[in-house]
């Protein structure tokens, strides 16, 4: 009986649908909708930066074995087209950001040229759109599981609705003139737009280029002029730049914000819901009276 157990377990896993999500936050959303019917792999893991990710042959194998792939798009995964081509995958691919209103901004390095902010998940309203797209994608790829995906999505959307009210109430306790902070890269524009906060960053929407001395000097002048109370680290970036800016301006160093990746399982942001709660907790701790 014992000898047969591993084979049974293996059969059970083989019957699951192999799904690839491009990064850890998306992997968690997919996992909540797919539940026990799917096996999810995130290409870019916890505390890792999707902007500068370099795929390996092992990642191509993951795509080749997948039945379904979920991508964020909006310019986040610049490496994905080459990886899909190299893998020869026949998986169905779904763009989870379909239907959101993209945030456009001036490209500081190319004046007159706009870039799209890919970090749409930082607004819970957008995360709900992601969940609906994941539900529909899984239902299309696996019609027998449609009712399961619909039930899972409905339950998870209710949790996101409660989370959104929680976030709005917490940010509402921060005085309006304190709702301005500095983060390493411009990952929180959707959060700021949704919940009434201003995030200023020495780096643009991607972390793939170091800010120039001129960019940093501009930020330092802005902090002094606007009396911005706090600067925050991100889990995916080198903290030294923020430490330098804080030292030169006297701004308080807030906690670590989770922007493009979850924490590992032992950290405070191991799921999307935990990530949003952790970020709000750090913001209110540093900014609320």
Regions found by a protein language model. Name each.
Residues 1-8:
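C-terminal segment of classical bacterial N-terminal signal peptides
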Residues 9-289:
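Extracytoplasmic metal-acquisition and chelation regions
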């Amino acid at each position: 009986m014992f000898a047969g157990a591993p084979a049974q377990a293996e059969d059970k896993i083989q019957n699951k649908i192999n799904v690839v999500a491009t990064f850890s936050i998306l992997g968690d959303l997919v996992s909540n909708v797919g539940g026990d019917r799917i096996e999810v792999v995130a290409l870019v893991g916890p505390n890792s930066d999707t902007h500068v990710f370099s795929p390996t042959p092992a990642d191509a194998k993951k795509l080749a074995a997948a039945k379904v792939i979920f991508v964020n798009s909006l310019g986040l995964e610049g490496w994905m087209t080459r990886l899909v081509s190299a893998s020869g995958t026949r998986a169905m691919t779904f763009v989870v950001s379909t239907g959101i209103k993209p945030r456009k901004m001036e490209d500081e390095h190319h004046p007159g040229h706009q870039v799209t902010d890919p970090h749409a998940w930082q607004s819970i309203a957008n995360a709900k759109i992601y969940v609906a797209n994941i539900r529909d994608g899984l239902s299309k790829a696996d019609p027998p599981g449609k009712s399961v995906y619909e039930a899972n999505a409905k339950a998870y959307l209710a949790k996101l609705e409660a989370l959104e009210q929680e976030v709005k109430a917490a940010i509402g306790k921060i005085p309006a003139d304190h709702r301005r902070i500095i983060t390493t890269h411009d990952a929180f524009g959707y959060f700021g737009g949704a919940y009434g906060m201003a995030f200023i960053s020495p780096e643009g929407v991607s972390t793939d280029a170091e800010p120039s001395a001129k960019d940093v000097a501009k930020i330092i002048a802005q902090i002094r002029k606007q009396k911005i109370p706090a600067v925050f680290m991100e889990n995916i970036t080198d903290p030294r730049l923020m430490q330098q800016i804080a030292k030169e301006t006297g701004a308080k160093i807030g906690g670590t914000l989770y922007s493009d990746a979850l924490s590992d399982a032992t950290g405070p942001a191991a799921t999307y819901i935990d990530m949003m709660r952790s970020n709000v907790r750090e913001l209110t701790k540093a900014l609320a009276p």
